C-alpha cells in the first residue's frame, strides 16, 4: 500500500448471471459501484473493485442446449463476445480492478476446497431435498415461502424438486445472523433488515440445499462426483477467491478482506445477508463490513428481467446519448436504496435540464465570455465584492463536505443534487452580475474579471466532484480550464485556479435533444427488428467440373450416439445410421458448438465415400456437412422424416 494512501477499500458488484445479454438494471448497479470506487480513489484510498460473472447452473445448461452449444461456449460468447459483458463495461467506462468468472480454474479448485472444509467440519451434510425450485432465480423455496404458489422473487412458476443433496446447516447460525442484522448496520437500507428477519429468520431458518444431481453444469463435489456445488455457494465465495483465498492465483486476501461493501440488487439480499455471513461464520472468517441492497429499475411498473424480455438495452442508450450522460442519469434520477421507474422521457429530460441547460450552459457561457472579453486569459487585476460574491463562494466552500456526507451513505442522488444546487446558483450569479453589461465599461474590467474567475473556479470544483459519475466529462472540462487541479484536497479549497487562468473553447458538452422527435426515433428503434451483423462471405473456391462433383456421395444419416473424444477440445465422435445396417463412425471438429447428447436422434448429411482417416488415434469414415460463416459453424440438419441412407441428388 502506498505511503500516501488513506487505507484500503474493497467494493464489489454481484457477479452477474450470463444467461443472456445484460440490461440497464445490471448497468445501474455496476455504474453505482464504479462511482463509489472512483470516489474512494479520488479521496486517496487503495481501492480494489471486483465484478464478474456467475456462470454455472441449470438455467445456463438449459439455454446452452437450446442454442446447440456447450455451456462453456455459451457463457464465453455472453461474457467475452461482441457486445458481451466485458464490452459493455468497457463502453460504460467501468474501472474494475479485477474480473472473475466462476469457470476460472483457480475459482473452481478453491470452491472444492471450501466445500470440503465445511463438510469435514460437519456444517455440510448429505440428505434428500424435497421442495420447490425456481430455475430462472436458481432458488429453492418451501411451500410456506411461495407467494400465490409462485416464486416470491420473480413471480414465475416453480417446479417440484426431489433429489439427493448436500445441505448447509444454516439453521445453526440463525441466532448469530439475526443478531448481526438487528443489532448492527451490516445490512442497509434498514427496511431490508425487517424483511429478512420477518420473512426468513423468525419463521424458522431451514438448512440450505448446496448441491444438485439433476444437472451437470457446475463445480463437481470432488469427494462425491455425482453432485455439483449449488450455484449460490459457488457464487458467494467469489468475493474471497478473487483475492487469492484457497488458491495461488492472487495474494490480496489479507490486504483487502473484509469487503467494505457489497452492492447487490434487493432480490439477492437474502443470500448476501443471511447465507453469506452464516457460511463465513462456519469458516471462521471475518464478515464483510456492509451489504447494501439497492432498488430495482422498473419498466411499466414491473421489474426488468432477461427471461421476461422486458429489458432496456444500455448499449443503445450509451451509443446514442453518450456514456457519461447515461451514467449521470442513472445515479441522478433514482434513489439508490429504492425502486425507480425508467422511461425514455425521464432520460431525455435529465439530459436537457441538468446537462445541457445547467452544466453545459454554465461551462460554455463562462468560457465563451472569457474569450470574448479577455481573449481567453483573465487579467491579474480583479475586484471582488463580498455582498455580491459571498453567497456563491460560501456554497462552493461547503460543497465538498456536503457531497462527502452523502457519498459515504451511498446517497448518490443527494450528492449530485448538492453539486447541481451550486451549478444552478452559478447560473443565477451570471444573471445577477450581467457580465455583458460590465464589459461595456472599461472601469469595470477588474470586476468583470473577478466575476468570470468566480465562475471558472466554481466550475472547477463542481466538475472535480462529478468525476466519479462522469469521468470523461470532467477531463474535458478541466482541459477547457487549462488543466485545472482536481485532486481531492484542491476540491475543498477556493482559489486553486491561477488568477490569470487561460481557457480554451470547445463544442457543446451536451447538445439539447428535441424531445418529440427523439421519442419517436426511440420508439422506432425499439419496435424494429435488430439488424443482423453478418460475417463476411468466405472467398469462393476454384471451379470444379460436374464430373468431379458427381463423384461426391452425400448420404442422409441419423445420429445413434455421440460423445466427446478424450484429450481433444474440438472433436466429437458420432455413431451413425447410414441405412446399411452397420453403424458408421465419423469424427467431426464441432465440440465447441454442440453438446453431444443434444445431437442424438438428429438427421444429418454425411459424405460417405471419403477414404477413412485416423484422427486422435480413431478412425473417421466420412465427413459431416456443416455451414461455416466467420467463426460460426452449424451442422446441416434435415427433417426427421427423411430415411437414413437416402442420397442427396
Show which residues each predicted segment covers:
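Short secondary-structure capping/junction motifs at helix and strand boundaries
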Residues: 92-99, 119-132, 144-145, 159-161, ...
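Cys/His-rich short segments
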Residues: 121-174, 178
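Structured secondary-structure scaffolds
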Residues: 2-51, 106-110, 154, 160-372, ...
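Intrinsic disorder at enzyme termini
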Residues: 477-548
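N-terminal catalytic cores of NTP/NDP-binding nucleotidyl/phosphoryl-transfer enzymes
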Residues: 2-74, 100-115, 120, 137, ...
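Phosphate-backbone binding interfaces of nucleic-acid-interacting proteins
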Residues: 530-649
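Helix-rich, typically C-terminal accessory recognition domains appended to large enzymatic cores
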Residues: 126, 333, 338, 346-383, ...
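A broadly conserved sequence feature marking short terminus-proximal activation segments
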Residues: 74-133
Amino acid at each position: 500500500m502506498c505511503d500516501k494512501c488513506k487505507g484500503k477499500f474493497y467494493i464489489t458488484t454481484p457477479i452477474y448471471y450470463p444467461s443472456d445479454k445484460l440490461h440497464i438494471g445490471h448497468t445501474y448497479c455496476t455504474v453505482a459501484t464504479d462511482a463509489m470506487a472512483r470516489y474512494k480513489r479520488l479521496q486517496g484510498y487503495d481501492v480494489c473493485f471486483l465484478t464478474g460473472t456467475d456462470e454455472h447452473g441449470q438455467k445456463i445448461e438449459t439455454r446452452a442446449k437450446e442454442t446447440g452449444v456447450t455451456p462453456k461456449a455459451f457463457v464465453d460468447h455472453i461474457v467475452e463476445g461482441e457486445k458481451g459483458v466485458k464490452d459493455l463495461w468497457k463502453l460504460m467506462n467501468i474501472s474494475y480492478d479485477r474480473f472473475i468468472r466462476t469457470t476460472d480454474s483457480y475459482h473452481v479448485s478453491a470452491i472444492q476446497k471450501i466445500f470440503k472444509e465445511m463438510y469435514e467440519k460437519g456444517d455440510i451434510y448429505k440428505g434428500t431435498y424435497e421442495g420447490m425450485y425456481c430455475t430462472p432465480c436458481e432458488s429453492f423455496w418451501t411451500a410456506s415461502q411461495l407467494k400465490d404458489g409462485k416464486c416470491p422473487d420473480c413471480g414465475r412458476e416453480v417446479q417440484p424438486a426431489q433429489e439427493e443433496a448436500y445441505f448447509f446447516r444454516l439453521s445453526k447460525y440463525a441466532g448469530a445472523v439475526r443478531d448481526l442484522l438487528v443489532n448492527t448496520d451490516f445490512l442497509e437500507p434498514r427496511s431490508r433488515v425487517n424483511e429478512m428477519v420477518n420473512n426468513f429468520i423468525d419463521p424458522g431458518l431451514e438448512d440450505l440445499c448446496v448441491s444438485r444431481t439433476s444437472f451437470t453444469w457446475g463445480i463437481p463435489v470432488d469427494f462425491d462426483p455425482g453432485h455439483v456445488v449449488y450455484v449460490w455457494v459457488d457464487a458467494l465465495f467469489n468475493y474471497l477467491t478473487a483475492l487469492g483465498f484457497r488458491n495461488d492465483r492472487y495474494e490480496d486476501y489479507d490486504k483487502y478482506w473484509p469487503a467494505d461493501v457489497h452492492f447487490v440488487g434487493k432480490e439477492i439480499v437474502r443470500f448476501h445477508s443471511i447465507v453469506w455471513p452464516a457460511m463465513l461464520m462456519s469458516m471462521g472468517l471475518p464478515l464483510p463490513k456492509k451489504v447494501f441492497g439497492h432498488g430495482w429499475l422498473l419498466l411499466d411498473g414491473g421489474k426488468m428481467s432477461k427471461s421476461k424480455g422486458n429489458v432496456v438495452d444500455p448499449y443503445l442508450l450509451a451509443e446514442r446519448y453518450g456514456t457519461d450522460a447515461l451514467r449521470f442519469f442513472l445515479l441522478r434520477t433514482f434513489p439508490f436504496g429504492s425502486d425507480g421507474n425508467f422511461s425514455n422521457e425521464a432520460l431525455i429530460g435529465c439530459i436537457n435540464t441538468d446537462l445541457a441547460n445547467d452544466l453545459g450552459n454554465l461551462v460554455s457561457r463562462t468560457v465563451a465570455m472569457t474569450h470574448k472579453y479577455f481573449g481567453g486569459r483573465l487579467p491579474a487585476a480583479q475586484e471582488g465584492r463580498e455582498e455580491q460574491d459571498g453567497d456563491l463562494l460560501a456554497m462552493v466552500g461547503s460543497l465538498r463536505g456536503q457531497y462527502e456526507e452523502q457519498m459515504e451513505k451511498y446517497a448518490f442522488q443527494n450528492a449530485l443534487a448538492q453539486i447541481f444546487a451550486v451549478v444552478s446558483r452559478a447560473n443565477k450569479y451570471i444573471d445577477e452580475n450581467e457580465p455583458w453589461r460590465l464589459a461595456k465599461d472599461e472601469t469595470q474590467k477588474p470586476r468583470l474579471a473577478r466575476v468570470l474567475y468566480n465562475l471558472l473556479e466554481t466550475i472547477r470544483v463542481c466538475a472535480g466532484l462529478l468525476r466519479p459519475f462522469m469521468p470523461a466529462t470532467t477531463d474535458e472540462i478541466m482541459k477547457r480550464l487549462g488543466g485545472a487541479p482536481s485532486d481531492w484536497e484542491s476540491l475543498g479549497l477556493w482559489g486553486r485556479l491561477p488568477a490569470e487562468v487561460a481557457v480554451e473553447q470547445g463544442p457543446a458538452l451536451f447538445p439539447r435533444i428535441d424531445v418529440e422527435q427523439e421519442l419517436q426515433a426511440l420508439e422506432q428503434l425499439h419496435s424494429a427488428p435488430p439488424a443482423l451483423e453478418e460475417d463476411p462471405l468466405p472467398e469462393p473456391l476454384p471451379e470444379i467440373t460436374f464430373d468431379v462433383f458427381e463423384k461426391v456421395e452425400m448420404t442422409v444419416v441419423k445420429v445413434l450416439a455421440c460423445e466427446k473424444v478424450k484429450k481433444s477440445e474440438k472433436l466429437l465422435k458420432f455413431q451413425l445410421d447410414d441405412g446399411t445396417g452397420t453403424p458408421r463412425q465419423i469424427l467431426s471438429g464441432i465440440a465447441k458448438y454442440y453438446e453431444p447428447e443434444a445431437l442424438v436422434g438428429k438427421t444429418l448429411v454425411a459424405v460417405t465415400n471419403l477414404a477413412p482417416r485416423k484422427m486422435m488415434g480413431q478412425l473417421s469414415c466420412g465427413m459431416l456437412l456443416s455451414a461455416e460463416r466467420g467463426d460460426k459453424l452449424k451442422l446441416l440438419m434435415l427433417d426427421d422424416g427423411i430415411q437414413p441412407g437416402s442420397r442427396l441428388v
